[in-house]
Amino acid sequence: MKAYWVCVYEKIDNAEKLKEYAVKAKPAIEKFSGKFLVRGGKNRTNDGIDSPRNVVVEFPDYNTAVECYDSKEYQEAHNILKGHVVRHHQIVEGG
């Protein structure tokens, strides 16, 4: 069963760091067969916090999604964001 990273950004303090993260994260995600379904774009908040950016990445299965997040390659990219964004990142299994 496929799995997804669902990332809801609450606050972005440094757009340049976000770009740097994206450049480094993309090959790490692709290494684990991750496919971007949503990256930014127009959105409407119906409930909860207004989000300046949303990202959804599809993986072949839950374990692969977890392995990617925990990988050295992705964590190196993730560290670029520390102190520059507030986001909610979940790994969910779905159909």
Per-segment meaning from a language model:
Residues M1-R53, P60-D70, E93-G95:
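Short S/T/G/P-rich N-terminal loop/turn motif that feeds into the first structured element of a domain
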Residues A65-Q90:
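C-terminal structural segments of small proteins and small subunits
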